[in-house]
Regions:
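Amphipathic alpha-helical segments used for helix-helix packing
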Residues: 105-126
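Helix-turn-helix
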Residues: 2, 20, 24-62, 66
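Amphipathic alpha-helical packing segments from all-alpha helical-bundle domains
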Residues: 76, 91-95, 124-148, 159, ...
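Hydrophobic alpha-helical connector segments
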Residues: 66, 80-108, 158-161
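Hydrophobic alpha-helical segments that form the core
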Residues: 153-172, 184-191
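N-terminal intrinsically disordered/low-complexity leader segments
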Residues: 1-16, 197-207
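Short, basic, alpha-helical segments at the C-terminal edge of helix-turn-helix-like DNA-binding modules
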Residues: 69-76
Length: 207
């Protein structure tokens, strides 16, 4: 007698509710804004229930926090990789702006997530808090890189580079010719650095 066999469905990797919610939030928040997108849209896109969202994050505000913190960690990891791949302080700083240039020119760029979230948030909201933390880190990064490159007033140069980054991100989002901002940002960083670092220091810092 032939034995009956039962076909089993192939195993598929299960994506956690947290990851599905973060993926949905990432897509919707970045495209439309953290304030405009409601919980109903998020859970529908993620394919989960409202209860799952609240059990996982507690509130929409905490989902916003997780969404931004996730991108904060990714940005830190990318920058760490860039710094490790370049030898001199000048090369490291300009490589960071080279990555910014590529980011702004990308077809998927819709502005800085942190600037957008902060603009929609009230003081104390998760979006504002994480945006402040990210921007403090970014300013510190530019200041440290300027100091290592030999800038006479590293704090001031760090602030100038920070404002350059902000301005380029806004211009790339608002202007129709997004590539113009992308092309200008690295050359502007070079000009700032050259003006801030005395020629004698450039040679020593490049070693």
């Amino acid at each position: 007698m032939a034995l009956k066999t039962t076909e089993r469905a192939p195993k598929t990797s299960r994506v956690s509710a947290r990851d599905r919610l973060l993926a949905a939030a990432d897509e919707l928040f970045y495209a439309e804004g953290v304030h405009v997108v409601g919980v109903d849209r998020i859970v529908e896109r993620a394919g989960v229930t409202k209860a799952s969202l609240y059990n996982t994050f507690g509130s929409k505000d905490e989902l916003v926090r997780a969404y931004l913190e996730n991108h904060f960690r990714r940005r830190q990891a990318r920058v760490a990789h860039i710094l490790a791949a370049n030898k001199t302080p000048r090369e490291r700083l300009l490589a960071v702006f080279g990555e910014v240039e590529d980011l702004l020119a990308g077809s998927a760029f819709r502005g800085c997530r942190f600037i957008s979230a902060a603009a929609e948030s009230q003081p104390g909201d998760a979006g504002a808090v994480v945006a402040d933390e990210y921007r403090a880190w970014l300013w510190s990064l530019f200041t440290d890189l300027a100091k290592e490159a030999g800038a006479t007033d590293a704090k001031q140069v760090g602030r100038q580079l920070f404002l350059l980054y902000d301005g380029a991100a806004v211009a790339a989002r608002m202007d129709q010719d997004r590539g113009a901002a992308a092309k200008a940002v690295k050359s502007a960083a070079i000009a700032l650095l050259d003006a801030a670092v005395p020629p004698k220091r450039r040679g020593r810092r490049a070693q």
